[in-house]
Amino acid sequence: PGWKMPADIRLQLRDNTLILSDNGGRSLYFEHLFPGEDGYSRSESLWLVRGGMAKLDEGHRLAALWQALPEELHLSPHRYLATNSPQGPWWVLGWCERVPEADEVLPAPLPPYRVLTGLVDRFGRTQTFHREAAGEFSGEITGVTDGAGRHFRLVLTTQAQRAEEARQQAISGGTEPSAFPDTLPGYTEYGRDNGIRLSAVWLTHDPEYPDNLPAAPLVRYGWTPRGELAAVYDRSNTQVRSFTYDDKYRGRMVAHRHTGRPEIRYRYDSDGRVTEQLNPAGLSYTYQYEKDRITITDSLDRREVLHTAGEGGLKRVVKKEHADGSVTQSQFDAVGRLKAQTDAAGRTTEYSPDVVTGLITRITTPDGRASAFYYNHHSQLTSATGTDGLEIRREYDES
């Protein structure tokens, strides 16, 4: 019902296992790593590397990216770094400082987990997340410093603070206060919910224009009494997005609107799947779900059928029946990468991905002719040979 940042990840350190989780509910398991060792998830194409090494082996795909890290990061065995590409960025997993208890023995041991403390791109530019050390927002990100030295303050609010603000606004406006509870359920189907939400983002320091900082937040967020994102306002305090939710199911969005555009509405089945997408100014769609099959019909009565195979994150569309009656089919390998596609005329094109990177190294057309692709350690295309035998080459500078 709240909001999430795709890169907001957390690492649990157990005796023989490392568990990398995001706040979308995904968890990846890695074996224990020694300093400088790495683990790789083929299903997610993601590396996890433990610090404590000045350089990685020269032939390692992440060797160049590793050198982009500040020395204090790649030399620290207590930090872990994750990336899904040899071109970066690195997600830096460390720990946030906290205020020790009065009777606590110091120095306190490091916690058995790591949280996101920053990002580093392949040019060495950093983005640092500052977390509160104490108080009601302890451990939460309340500040960000970017690579240009600009500092942004993230204003967080609790459910009780938003409830009090709603009551004060009602009193000052001479209206009856609406029902706005002081607390939210501590646990929902989306996971634990402490009721803390991002309410505004301010630019508080800009080294280029230190005396010309904006007098208003860059963006502001409004929330429903149930903690759902209700509206987004830009720096001129103009509402640019709005959201509506199901009365019965907390967090289930039933409508959204961009300012100046029509409202898009959604209907759901008893399993929480979208059955209708209604657009008053364009095409609307209905969705019918069966086992390994989804039927999509638009408001012009055109129908497509998607046939799926696999489970969870490896579920893929293996066959598509188009509105014109034609059928296309796709094949995937064990980790969900495309291997072949067959068009409506029965012609098959084959794809050969690299075992480690997933990058396409060869495409074979239905008539047996092949194209080949070659990459550098940054996963950048360096040369390609077409079916006609012609070759193209690309060169890149050091940056």
Annotate each PLM feature.
Residues 1-7, 11-399:
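Extended charged/polar low-complexity repeat regions
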